[in-house]
């Protein structure tokens, strides 16, 4: 039996109501696709005649966190931002198997449903891992690959994982200002939304599989990697 990532049906309902209130204020189109891996929710912006870029968010976030990036890109690109299944968004509430080809197969289904033979992919943290998973499996479908503090290139730092697991056990949350945003102050509205996410669902609590050098050699497209000096991931 599949297990929802949400802590209760009530928490899921409340979280999604708040999330959708944010989305309604954004000048983007939305769509929901049916796939063999459940529903996939996407934001869409920009002219269909423009080059396509698909954005994949990190853990404990969703497509709304790409707002500023979509606003900057939509004048030159046809932008899609997908809520990853098993994360805190409007897509399927069931997490896929990280050790299998499930997430690569899911994204292939999404691109096929959208009629997109080839796209540029951009991923942050967990989303970077998803982008790598797809790009190593289907390099011919990826025009360019952009990774921001991506998982999957090295083991996650043990001290960060220990703090996250301790916070989860104590039903607390990490300080996003200090532990995730590198000390940069985040607006209270965003912090409240992040805390609502952490109160509503169970994030991935195991290290992401690391891609071997042999797998990374399958990347035939141009790759941009951006990371912070003190990045925990």
Regions found by a protein language model. Give the residues of each.
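Alpha/beta-hydrolase fold catalytic core
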Residues: 1-51, 76-77, 117
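Conserved HGGG/HGGXW glycine-rich cap/lid loop of the alpha/beta-hydrolase fold
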Residues: 38-89
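Conserved alpha/beta-hydrolase "nucleophile elbow" surrounding the catalytic nucleophile
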Residues: 57-59, 119, 123-128, 228
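Active-site loop/oxyanion-hole signature of alpha/beta-hydrolase fold enzymes
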Residues: 81-122
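Catalytic nucleophile serine of serine hydrolases
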Residues: 83, 125, 149
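Flexible "cap/lid" loop of the alpha/beta hydrolase fold
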Residues: 129-137, 142-173
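Short beta-strand/loop motif that positions the catalytic acidic residue
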Residues: 219, 225-227, 231
């Amino acid at each position: 039996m599949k297990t929802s990532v949400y802590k209760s049906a009530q928490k899921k309902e409340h979280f999604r109501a708040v999330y959708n209130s944010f989305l309604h204020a954004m000048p983007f189109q939305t769509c929901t696709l049916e796939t063999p891996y459940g529903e996939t929710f996407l934001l869409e912006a920009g002219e269909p005649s423009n080059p396509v870029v698909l954005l994949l968010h990190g853990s404990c976030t969703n497509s709304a966190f790409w707002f500023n990036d979509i606003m900057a890109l939509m004048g030159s690109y046809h932008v899609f931002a997908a809520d990853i299944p098993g994360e805190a968004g409007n897509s399927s509430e069931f997490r896929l198997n990280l050790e299998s080809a499930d997430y690569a197969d899911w994204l292939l289904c999404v691109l096929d449903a959208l009629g997109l033979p080839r796209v540029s992919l951009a991923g942050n943290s967990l989303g970077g891992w998803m982008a790598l998973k797809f790009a190593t499996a289907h390099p011919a479908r990826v025009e360019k690959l952009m990774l921001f503090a991506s998982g999957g290139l090295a083991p996650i730092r043990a001290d960060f994982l220990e703090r996250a697991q301790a916070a989860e056990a104590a039903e607390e949350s990490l300080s996003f200002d200090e532990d995730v945003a590198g000390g940069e102050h985040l607006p209270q509205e965003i912090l409240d939304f992040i805390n609502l996410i952490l109160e509503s669902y169970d994030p991935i609590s195991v290290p992401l599989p690391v891609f071997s050098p042999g797998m990374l050699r399958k990347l035939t497209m141009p790759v941009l990697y951006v990371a912070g000096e003190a990045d925990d991931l």
